[in-house]
Curated annotation (Swiss-Prot):
Pfam families hit by this protein: Arg_repressor (PF01316), Arg_repressor_C (PF02863)
Keywords for this protein: Amino-acid biosynthesis, Arginine biosynthesis, Cytoplasm, DNA-binding, Repressor, Transcription, Transcription regulation
Alphabetical list of PANTHER family matching this protein: ARGININE REPRESSOR
Record GO cellular component, one term: cytoplasm
Record-level GO BP terms: L-arginine biosynthetic process; protein complex oligomerization; regulation of arginine biosynthetic process
SUPFAM superfamilies from the UniProt entry: C-terminal domain of arginine repressor, Winged helix' DNA-binding domain
Function: Regulates arginine biosynthesis genes.
Protein name: Arginine repressor
Gene name for this UniProt entry: argR
Organism per entry: Renibacterium salmoninarum (strain ATCC 33209 / DSM 20767 / JCM 11484 / NBRC 15589 / NCIMB 2235)
Location in or out of the cell: Cytoplasm
InterPro entries: Arg_repress, Arg_repress_C, Arg_repress_C_sf, Arg_repress_DNA-bd, WH-like_DNA-bd_sf, WH_DNA-bd_sf
Pathway noted in the entry: Amino-acid biosynthesis; L-arginine biosynthesis [regulation]
Similarity comment: family membership: Belongs to the ArgR family.
Molecular function per GO: arginine binding; DNA binding; DNA-binding transcription factor activity
Length: 179
């Protein structure tokens, strides 16, 4: 092989034909770029040598917890960051966490209602797990935890009567300017 042809040859990353490898590649693609449709995602996977049917891709997206969120002037797929350490590190400021929660609430929060120490947050279908995970990762001190369904997040306040204040905070996050 000549020096010229050796310079042209690019190494090719091989992706195993396993469900785990396919889902890892899907998560990586959704994290790296805005993907607006399953057809676009299937084309990106095909470019990587991963052939997938629409039904399999749909199941993979559900299993990954992918949801469609508003970004770049339209809806794009997003995957929650699973396995992330929930303890904030020094590099992550309160301002960053508040800005992230503001953005997510502006994109996902439909309503917030409280009763005693409980807050019920409504989201578009399929987005509740994404919002609940973001709340859990933000480590808000007055929140004990969350439980998510398809379009509903139950937030449990530490204070027996703190639900109203937390509901109000989420509504403020959703209404802040610049979102």
């Amino acid at each position: 092989m000549s020096a010229e042809s050796a310079a042209i040859v690019q190494p090719i990353a091989l992706i195993p034909a396993t469900k785990t490898a396919r889902q890892a590649r899907i998560a990586a693609l959704l994290t790296a770029q805005s993907v607006r449709s399953q057809a676009e995602l299937a084309a990106l996977l095909a470019d990587d040598g991963v052939q997938v049917t629409q039904a399999t891709l749909s199941r993979d997206l559900v299993e990954l917890g992918a949801v469609r969120v508003r970004a770049d002037g339209g809806l794009v797929y997003a995957v929650p960051q699973a396995g992330v350490d929930r303890t904030p590190h020094a590099a992550v400021s309160k301002e960053y966490l508040d800005a992230r929660m503001t953005r997510l609430c502006a994109e996902l929060l439909v309503t917030a209602e409280a009763s005693a120490n409980l807050v019920v947050l409504r989201t578009p279908p399929g987005a509740a797990n994404f919002l609940a995970m973001a709340i859990d990762h933000s480590v808000l001190p007055d929140i004990l935890g969350t439980i998510a369904g398809d379009d509903t997040v139950l937030v449990i306040a530490r204070d027996p009567f703190g639900g109203a204040a937390i509901a109000e905070r989420f509504l403020q996050f959703a209404e802040e300017p610049g979102t």
